[in-house]
Amino acid sequence: LLESATNSFRPKLLQIYASGNTETLVSEFKKAMKTTGMISNIIFTGFVVCGRDLFRLWLPTQNAEFLYIIAIIVLMSDIIIGVVKPLYYVFTLTKKLKVPCFITIATGIINVVSMYILIRYTSLGAYAVVLTTLVLNYVHFFDTPIYAAYCLKVKLTTFYSSIIEHFLTCFIQVFLMYWAFLRFPNCDNWLT
């Protein structure tokens, strides 16, 4: 879903980039970030609010709380990736793919090594897998907006206003939806 939303902006972004209008291009990237951020926020909020009941009803013989926590940690990664995903296209447009490729390879190697170390030498178990991925996805919170701005020759903090707005919106959305959810009766079976 997120990939489809991101891809839908690409033809217009390409057209604007070809025209050389950087200001309009940055504005369009911010719109794309807002859209993909909104989609990832809706998914995350829905899962935070309803996920526990979903797992409890869907998999009654499994440890629903464990599954819920793992799912939330995985989706927290998507909160980061969701908002910066459109910026990956900057590297394709500007033909500056080396740095993002090296960062992706490096974080992949660090991810595997750190998972192995945490699984082998700690009692984290499955949490080690999702937590290392979450922590390393935060790298994209820093490198992607800065390098995208660098490639477009704009101020390095250009995209952070959209990212901060995304995180604030996510926090408010989760709070309001959870508050509303608590007003409904408990869900004990598929019919209620």
What function would you assign to each model-found segment?
Residues 1, 12-16, 52-63, 181-188:
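Helix-terminus/linker motif at the lipid-water interface of multi-pass membrane proteins
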Residues 1-33, 88-93:
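Helix-loop junctions and terminal segments of transmembrane helices
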Residues 29-82, 112-116, 171, 178-179:
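Alpha-helical transmembrane segments of multi-pass membrane transport and lipid-handling proteins
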Residues 30-38, 69-75, 98, 102-106, ...:
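Internal alpha-helical transmembrane segments of multi-pass membrane proteins, especially GPCRs
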Residues 31, 44, 53, 78, ...:
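Residue-level recognition of pore/gate-forming positions within transmembrane alpha-helices
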Residues 98, 105-141, 149, 154-157, ...:
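Membrane-interface helix-loop junctions in multi-pass transport and translocation proteins
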